[in-house]
Amino acid sequence: MSHLLTMSELSEQEISEILKDAEDFANGKERKTTEQTFVANLFFENSTRTRFSFEVAEKRLGLEVLDFSADASSVQKGETLYDTIRTLESIGTKAVVIRHEQDRYFDELKDQVNIPILNAGDGCGNHPTQCLLDLLTIKQEFGRFEGLKIAIVGDVRHSRVARSNAEALTKLGATIYFASPEEWKDEENTFGTYKSLDELVPEVDVMMLLRVQHERHDHYETDIMKEYHEQHGLTVEREKRMKEGSIIMHPAPVNRDVEIASELVECERSRIFKQMENGVYVRMAVLKRALPNVLGGMKHELFV
């Protein structure tokens, strides 16, 4: 069964196949099932990009989408996540997409359910489809991962994007650097080296900014925000010193004039909205992987 829970579980070959399928979808090579197939989206945290791009991906593949609301479900009556998934499985759902506030919520589910789980984000833990769409964006830009220098900047400790991306990009041959306020460093993430932002600006090929996750912060950390943009954000002045041909990325939502100057969000270097576009193609690809009997399977040569 093809769960997608973390980037750790994917080999280079599997990453390559997913990205090749995503590129095919981006180039208009869509396939649509004529067999009625139900997929449920279970979002226990707020989401715009991930939730709606999964829904667009599902509908473009001809899947029937069951839109789940935790507030209107039996979760409010104490039903467990396991029982919710087993219920959906029993009534004919073929896969579930889940975003949950609990880190690694899937550990207690993956060996007990009989339908694929696609992780749309777990707490501060993992965000594999965001990582894959970021990989697709980088691949489109540079044609490779090997030898690239990538800075992951900002709220590293609370970021599932930082964890997933640093691990996957290291596996694919890129060099990862982190820049972060001291309080937001993640000592458990060993896939990169910490440097100052100003040192990294002229060196890296990709400046990957992270959202400041106010909802996960302790109250004492609010002091960091007073001068965050000037000290830790991508200002107009810093962008001017970036390496020729380098790009700006951000998983969004963007806090304008916090992580990045507002006028840079859609500047020539920015690939922020391209990432969002690629999210649909990547999620089509992971749905195809999860439902090979419905959507078919293809093998592709390794490109990395």
Swiss-Prot record:
Catalyses which reaction(s): carbamoyl phosphate + L-aspartate = N-carbamoyl-L-aspartate + phosphate + H(+)
Protein name: Aspartate carbamoyltransferase catalytic subunit
Function: Catalyzes the condensation of carbamoyl phosphate and aspartate to form carbamoyl aspartate and inorganic phosphate, the committed step in the de novo pyrimidine nucleotide biosynthesis pathway.
SUPFAM superfamilies from the UniProt entry: Aspartate/ornithine carbamoyltransferase (SSF53671)
Subunit structure: Heterododecamer (2C3:3R2) of six catalytic PyrB chains organized as two trimers (C3), and six regulatory PyrI chains organized as three dimers (R2).
Binding site for carbamoyl phosphate: 49-50, 99, 127, 130, 252-253
The family this protein is said to belong to: Belongs to the aspartate/ornithine carbamoyltransferase superfamily. ATCase family.
